[in-house]
């Protein structure tokens, strides 16, 4: 009887013996196969004597046989013992002598056995939001600002204006690297600069020259500037005011072929806001459920699964910045370790929710999700057809739907409270 030993955490070790007869037969068969195609000077193909084949190819054949026997016998055992394997095993050969049993150990990780608990202790706050006319008004203003133009003014700069400036920064009378710029365009009121910089410009007009004194934040990204007091000599070259477009037919037409009036535009905006709100609410509830699941179910995760997830995150990070696989490997694993561990935890816990509740992806919900995605495009019917003909995309949608069903299954047992909220509170929680 084979005994699988627990070494630590999710790591397991097992000793496996392969009978000498099995090894001998495998070596003999492989030598015969090699002999059929071996080319040795002085002999015809396939007619090389066995002792020469053994002398020339014996060592490499035995290594090839070993490389085949180790994983084959391990995976046979893993299947027989119903091992929930995580990652690849490592092998240590203890005996591999001719005519004797092959003895080796395999060290491997398994996925944790999960018994979900504490679902009734999970607390979820569910925002209840109604999109108001004022919310739509605000979004109309956002769209107008996105299409705004700028006009020069002789007035003093305000927090809603844009300025073009030259500046030179110094610390203790010495200029510092990165502290100088010409024709620098700065949109006021957005907090792009260090504290006090924009405030020092407010109230000044084009053509004015002046100095301001500020202090770099203690957490500033440049080490030698942290918490340092600095002086900036500033020249205001231009002050511009924002000119918002009127709600003309031309402006309205930019937002779709079916938007012809202000009412059409507002209806389209409201529909988009409802879609964005739905996604935001789903994400907020999902995050609370996942946080609760992890808090109530502390589980070990396999190092192999975390390592695999780290590589995924590394490659995604490299691609975002235009890099490749080689550059991804240079990114420190510490940057991704916590996120990778959490993703593995979430995957395992949700998989257990799905399994224990015997959930299957609801095809009607998948169809509704595709239609919702398609509604954001000018030709929704074409988008729906594209999804329906792409198996990979359809499977991705089904996986998302299945995950949502798992979240709903947890919600059904959790402590859910509703809280009246505004659109802005949900969409801009950090504001």
Swiss-Prot record:
Stated name of the protein: Trigger factor
Enzyme class: isomerase
Signal peptide: none
Comment, domains: Consists of 3 domains; the N-terminus binds the ribosome, the middle domain has PPIase activity, while the C-terminus has intrinsic chaperone activity on its own.
Keyword DNA-binding belongs to the record: no
Superkingdom of this protein's organism: Bacteria
GO BP terms in the entry: 'de novo' cotranslational protein folding; cell division; chaperone-mediated protein folding; protein transport; protein unfolding
Keywords of the record: Cell cycle, Cell division, Chaperone, Cytoplasm, Isomerase, Rotamase
GO molecular-function terms, A-Z: peptidyl-prolyl cis-trans isomerase activity; protein folding chaperone; ribosome binding
Pfam families named in the record: FKBP_C, Trigger_C, Trigger_N
InterPro entries noted in UniProt: PPIase_dom_sf, PPIase_FKBP_dom, Trig_fac, Trigger_fac_C, Trigger_fac_C_sf, Trigger_fac_ribosome-bd_bac, Trigger_fac_ribosome-bd_sf, Trigger_fact/SurA_dom_sf
Catalytic reaction annotation: [protein]-peptidylproline (omega=180) = [protein]-peptidylproline (omega=0)
Residue span, PPIase FKBP-type domain: 160-245
């Amino acid at each position: 009887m084979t005994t699988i030993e627990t070494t630590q955490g999710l790591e397991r070790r097992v000793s496996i013996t392969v009978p000498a007869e099995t090894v001998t037969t495998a070596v003999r068969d492989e030598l015969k196969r090699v002999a059929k195609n071996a080319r040795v000077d002085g002999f015809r193909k396939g007619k090389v004597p066995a002792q020469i084949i053994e002398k020339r190819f014996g060592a490499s054949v035995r290594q090839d046989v070993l490389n085949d026997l180790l994983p084959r016998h391990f995976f046979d055992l893993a299947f027989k013992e119903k091992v929930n394997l995580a990652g690849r095993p490592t092998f240590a050969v203890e005996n591999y002598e001719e005519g004797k049993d092959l003895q080796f150990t395999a060290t491997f990780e398994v996925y944790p056995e999960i018994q979900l608990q504490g679902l009734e202790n999970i607390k979820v706050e569910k925002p209840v939001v109604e999109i108001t006319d004022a919310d739509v008004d605000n979004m109309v203003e956002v769209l107008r600002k996105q299409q705004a133009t700028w006009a020069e003014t002789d007035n003093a700069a305000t927090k809603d204006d844009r300025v073009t400036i030259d500046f030179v920064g110094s610390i203790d009378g010495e200029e510092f690297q990165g502290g100088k710029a010409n024709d620098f365009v700065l949109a006021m009121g957005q907090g792009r600069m260090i504290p006090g910089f924009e405030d020092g410009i407010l109230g000044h007009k084009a053509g004015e020259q002046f100095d301001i004194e500020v202090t770099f934040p203690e957490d500033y990204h440049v080490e030698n500037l942290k918490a340092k007091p600095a002086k900036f000599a500033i020249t205001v070259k231009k002050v511009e005011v924002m000119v918002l477009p009127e709600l003309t037919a031309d402006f309205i037409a930019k937002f779709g072929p079916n938007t012809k009036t202000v009412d059409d535009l507002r209806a389209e905006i409201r529909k988009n806001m409802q879609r964005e709100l739905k996604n935001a609410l789903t994400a907020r509830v999902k995050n609370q459920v996942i946080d609760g699941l992890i808090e109530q179910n502390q589980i070990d995760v396999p190092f192999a699964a975390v390592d695999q997830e780290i590589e995924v995150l590394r490659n995604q990070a490299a691609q975002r910045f235009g890099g490749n696989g080689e550059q991804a490997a240079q990114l420190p694993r510490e940057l991704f370790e916590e996120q990778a561990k959490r993703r593995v935890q979430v995957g395992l816990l949700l998989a257990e929710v799905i399994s224990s509740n015997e959930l299957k992806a609801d095809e009607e919900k998948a169809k509704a999700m595709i239609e919702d995605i398609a509604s954001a495009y000018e030709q929704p019917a074409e988008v729906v057809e594209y999804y329906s003909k792409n198996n990979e995309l359809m499977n991705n949608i089904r996986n998302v739907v299945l995950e949502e069903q798992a979240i709903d299954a947890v919600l059904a047992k959790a402590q859910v409270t509703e809280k009246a909220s505004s659109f802005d509170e949900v969409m801009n929680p950090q504001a």
